A protein has these predicted regions:
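Alpha/beta-hydrolase-fold enzymes
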Residues: 13-14, 27-135
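Short beta-strand immediately N-terminal to the catalytic nucleophile in serine-hydrolase-like folds
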Residues: 18-20, 45, 174
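Gly/Ala-rich beta-loop-alpha elbow adjacent to hydrolase catalytic centers
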Residues: 19-24, 28
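Short beta-strand/loop motif that positions the catalytic acidic residue
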Residues: 167, 173-175, 179
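Conserved alpha/beta-hydrolase "acid-adjacent" motif
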Residues: 180-186
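Catalytic histidine-centered segment of alpha/beta-hydrolase-like enzymes
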Residues: 181, 206-222
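Catalytic histidine neighborhood in serine/cysteine hydrolases
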Residues: 192-211
Length: 244
């Protein structure tokens, strides 16, 4: 996956800004540490980076469950982890209207035609699950959740161990205050692992759960525009010193 990303970055000119949500966040951080000269700015939202820094429902489950259980999930899917099976496992398929209303942060009242339309769109999206390759899934469970290899510097990417301290690009960390999957501390620990100067690190904690980071009305209307403005600001590292 990192190899393909690297090919794409080269096709785009060799330097990019990266925005990584959830699992895409730790992958983006790995890329930025593996190829630090190719990432100008980095945004991580709801991304599990240092599992030992805090506990979430997901990391607690991964820690308490034997690896054989996850291998069994892959076997049941004939080499894949079936999205609808995992959804049932989490119980997220039973979201009621109040939970959806809270997640979307919409002003439309429950029972109104406008909310009914939003709810139908959400349920259609929510029912469209994605199957994951078993090899990838097991690697995430074992290396990220069981051994915390990203934070400890043991993760091997494209033949080399990843040293997060080599990543010195400006970084924005966005956490969900009530995240059931990624504890805010698991994300915010990033600032102590990377080589980015403190003045080039921005952090925000949004009043939502995990999915609200990219679906909540308030978050989309207030937090992401702030991140977008930050991304287009000049990078102070590239500014020439003022003449004496």
């Amino acid at each position: 996956m990192l190899f393909r990303s690297n090919v794409l970055v080269d096709q785009l000119g060799g330097t990019v800004d990266l925005v990584g949500l959830c699992q895409g966040g730790w992958l983006s951080l790995l890329y930025a540490a593996r190829f630090p000269a190719k990432v100008s700015k980095l945004v991580l939202a709801g991304a599990p980076i240092d599992i030992a820094a805090g506990q979430s429902a997901l990391s607690a489950l991964a820690d308490a469950s034997p690896l054989a259980l996850f291998h069994e999930l892959v076997t049941l899917g004939e080499g894949r982890v079936l999205g609808h099976k995992v959804q049932k496992f989490w119980g997220s398929e039973t979201l009621d209207s109040r939970e959806i209303h809270r997640l979307l942060q919409t002003p439309e009242p429950i029972g109104s035609p406008a909310f009914a339309e939003l709810e139908a769109i959400f349920r259609d999206w929510h029912a469209w699950t994605v199957d994951l390759p078993g090899t990838y899934y097991l690697e995430v469970i074992e290396k990220l959740y069981k051994r915390n290899e990203i934070a400890t510097g043991q993760f091997i990417a494209l033949g080399e161990p990843i040293d997060l301290a080599t990543m010195r690009a400006p970084i924005f960390l966005l956490a969900a205050r009530n995240d059931e999957l990624v504890a805010p501390a698991q994300l915010f620990a990033t600032e102590h692992l990377v080589g980015t100067p403190a003045r080039a690190i921005r952090k925000a904690s949004a009043p939502c759960g995990h999915a609200g980071l990219f679906m909540g009305r308030t978050i989309l209307g207030e937090y992401w525009p702030r991140i977008a403005r930050w991304m287009i600001e000049p990078d102070s590292r590239s500014l020439a010193p003022a003449a004496a």
